Amino acid sequence: MAELQPLALQLEQLLNPRPREADPEADPEEATRARVIDRFDEGEEEEDDLPVSSIRKLAPVSLLDTDKRYSGKTTSRKAWKEDHWDQTLPSSSDNEIPDEGGSEAGDSEGLEELSEDVEEDLEDNEIPDEGGSEDGDSEGLEEEISEDVEEDLEGEDEEDREEDRNSEDDGVVMAFSGVKVSEEVEKGRAVKNQIALWDQLLEGRIKLQKALLTTNQLPQPDVFPVFKDKGGPEFASALKNSHKALKALLRSLVDLQEELLFQYPDTRYLVKGTKPNAESEEISSEDDELVGEKKKQRKAPPKRKLEMEDYPSFMAKRSADFTVYRNRTLQKWHDKTKLASGKLGKGFGAFERSILTQIDHILMDKERLLRRTQTKRSAYRVLGKPEPVPEPVAETLPGEPESLPQVPANAHLKDLDEEIFDDDDFYHQLLRELIERKTSSLDPNDQVAMGRQWLAIQKLRSKIRKKVDRKASKGRKLRFHVLSKLLSFMAPIDHTAMNDEARTELYRSLFGQLNRLDADHGQ
């Protein structure tokens, strides 16, 4: 009997009259044809749903339907979490054990309740065997349960102790971090004040440089009596006023130095006149408090009244006493910078000399240092000395090139004068560092200043490293000279070194005319 085809398959065959290719592996018999079934029964008994018993039908109605107190309400996840945490936090605090007595009482009550429950369970589940075994089992169960409860309580106590320790550790960490932050803030303020103080001292040094240049122009001892005789009372009054002003300036500078030395505990011995402490190190907080109390008692160093003749010896003694603190401070910061930079013991670092050895080595050649301070580096004229006469320039004829007089190199550095003090090289170095520091902290929005700084950096880079074209050697690159554009009727400027005859020979050799000329000359 032919199988009835579904309607969809019949319609598809009508719409597509092309005959379908038969599958050679398909089974024409319906009984033996492979087919897919929903479930294969292997003989297992199906567990049908059991009907509800009559006892369940007689059960009371749910409390949710009868009592409104047990009815629920819609809520959001966020509100549920907040209510959940609000409920769990007080419950955890209620479980805390106030003291040891209360904990022991609670443990005993919990053990009694558990033992009663175990006895009831044993009475309900009695086994009709030996009576002694029942008693032994119940006692063993009671002991095991009591041990488990004690272990649980001990574990809770340990967890509470760990939480307390963690909270204490968090407090210590927070306090430690707060102390660290406050220390860093204080260090930053100290560095800022130190930079401001350095800028003020440098500003005073710049103002004193003008006075130094004026002092170098004053008459020297060999001609000073002549100026004094010819100057008269006007010169004497001006000399007296300048002497008073100079004395007041020296007194102010000495007071400023003593005030700065007295404020710092490590240099206070210089003002008091006591011996320095060789084992002086960084001051602790307790020492700072003592120093603050002493400062309140004595806020200023003692005033000194010195005459002009006493200042040279006083400053020499002060400089010698300051050497101990200077050497100790230089060595300390030199070691710190070496450790911070990581250059200690690497390469030739073991052969490096200490900073104090280098300073002593430089100070050994005192004659050279004195000559550097007695060298006239600026253009000024000392009163009482004749002006330097420039060398006459030889006259040149109209057709001859102009010849300049030959001046030896560094001639201005050979102008020595023992009566002057000139440190323009050190002064210019200070100015250069000041300008670099000021320009490094420019406003990024100031495009003009940033452009100037960028040009200065580019100049320094071009001096440090020059661009070299390594491919231009051995004739691998064509060399040429760019001529400037001609303006209006301007004649071209010939920059080549070849003359007309050389050009003629070049062109003749290129086009083969040179050989013909040689042949004509030979005939």
From Swiss-Prot:
<feature type="modified residue" description="Phosphoserine">
    <location>
        <position position="285"/>
    </location>
</feature>
<feature type="region of interest" description="Disordered">
    <location>
        <begin position="273"/>
        <end position="305"/>
    </location>
</feature>
<keyword id="KW-0007">Acetylation</keyword>
<feature type="compositionally biased region" description="Acidic residues">
    <location>
        <begin position="96"/>
        <end position="171"/>
    </location>
</feature>
<feature type="modified residue" description="Phosphoserine">
    <location>
        <position position="62"/>
    </location>
</feature>
<dbReference type="InterPro" id="IPR039223">
    <property type="entry name" value="AATF/Bfr2"/>
</dbReference>
<comment type="similarity">
    <text>Belongs to the AATF family.</text>
</comment>
<feature type="modified residue" description="Phosphoserine">
    <location>
        <position position="237"/>
    </location>
</feature>
<feature type="region of interest" description="Disordered">
    <location>
        <begin position="13"/>
        <end position="172"/>
    </location>
</feature>
<comment type="subunit">
    <text>Binds PAWR, POLR2J, RB1/RB, RBL1/P107, RBL2/P130 and SP1. Binds DAPK3/ZIPK and TSG101. May also bind MAPT.</text>
</comment>
<dbReference type="GO" id="GO:0040016">
    <property type="term" value="P:embryonic cleavage"/>
</dbReference>
<dbReference type="InterPro" id="IPR012617">
    <property type="entry name" value="AATF_C"/>
</dbReference>
<feature type="modified residue" description="Phosphoserine">
    <location>
        <position position="280"/>
    </location>
</feature>
<feature type="modified residue" description="Phosphoserine">
    <location>
        <position position="284"/>
    </location>
</feature>
<dbReference type="GO" id="GO:2001234">
    <property type="term" value="P:negative regulation of apoptotic signaling pathway"/>
</dbReference>
<dbReference type="GO" id="GO:0042254">
    <property type="term" value="P:ribosome biogenesis"/>
</dbReference>
<dbReference type="Pfam" id="PF13339">
    <property type="entry name" value="AATF-Che1"/>
</dbReference>
<keyword id="KW-0053">Apoptosis</keyword>
<feature type="compositionally biased region" description="Acidic residues">
    <location>
        <begin position="279"/>
        <end position="290"/>
    </location>
</feature>
<keyword id="KW-0597">Phosphoprotein</keyword>
<dbReference type="InterPro" id="IPR025160">
    <property type="entry name" value="AATF"/>
</dbReference>
<feature type="modified residue" description="Phosphoserine">
    <location>
        <position position="167"/>
    </location>
</feature>
<dbReference type="GO" id="GO:0005634">
    <property type="term" value="C:nucleus"/>
</dbReference>
<keyword id="KW-0539">Nucleus</keyword>
<dbReference type="GO" id="GO:0005667">
    <property type="term" value="C:transcription regulator complex"/>
</dbReference>
<dbReference type="GO" id="GO:0006915">
    <property type="term" value="P:apoptotic process"/>
</dbReference>
<dbReference type="GO" id="GO:0048156">
    <property type="term" value="F:tau protein binding"/>
</dbReference>
<dbReference type="GO" id="GO:0032040">
    <property type="term" value="C:small-subunit processome"/>
</dbReference>
<dbReference type="GO" id="GO:0007155">
    <property type="term" value="P:cell adhesion"/>
</dbReference>
<dbReference type="GO" id="GO:0042985">
    <property type="term" value="P:negative regulation of amyloid precursor protein biosynthetic process"/>
</dbReference>
<dbReference type="GO" id="GO:0019901">
    <property type="term" value="F:protein kinase binding"/>
</dbReference>
<protein>
    <recommendedName>
        <fullName>Protein AATF</fullName>
    </recommendedName>
</protein>
<dbReference type="GO" id="GO:0043066">
    <property type="term" value="P:negative regulation of apoptotic process"/>
</dbReference>
<dbReference type="GO" id="GO:0005737">
    <property type="term" value="C:cytoplasm"/>
</dbReference>
<feature type="compositionally biased region" description="Acidic residues">
    <location>
        <begin position="41"/>
        <end position="50"/>
    </location>
</feature>
<feature type="region of interest" description="Binds RB1 and SP1">
    <location>
        <begin position="336"/>
        <end position="435"/>
    </location>
</feature>
<dbReference type="GO" id="GO:0007346">
    <property type="term" value="P:regulation of mitotic cell cycle"/>
</dbReference>
<dbReference type="GO" id="GO:0043522">
    <property type="term" value="F:leucine zipper domain binding"/>
</dbReference>
<dbReference type="GO" id="GO:0045893">
    <property type="term" value="P:positive regulation of DNA-templated transcription"/>
</dbReference>
<dbReference type="GO" id="GO:0005730">
    <property type="term" value="C:nucleolus"/>
</dbReference>
<feature type="modified residue" description="N-acetylalanine">
    <location>
        <position position="2"/>
    </location>
</feature>
<feature type="region of interest" description="Binds to TSG101">
    <location>
        <begin position="447"/>
        <end position="523"/>
    </location>
</feature>
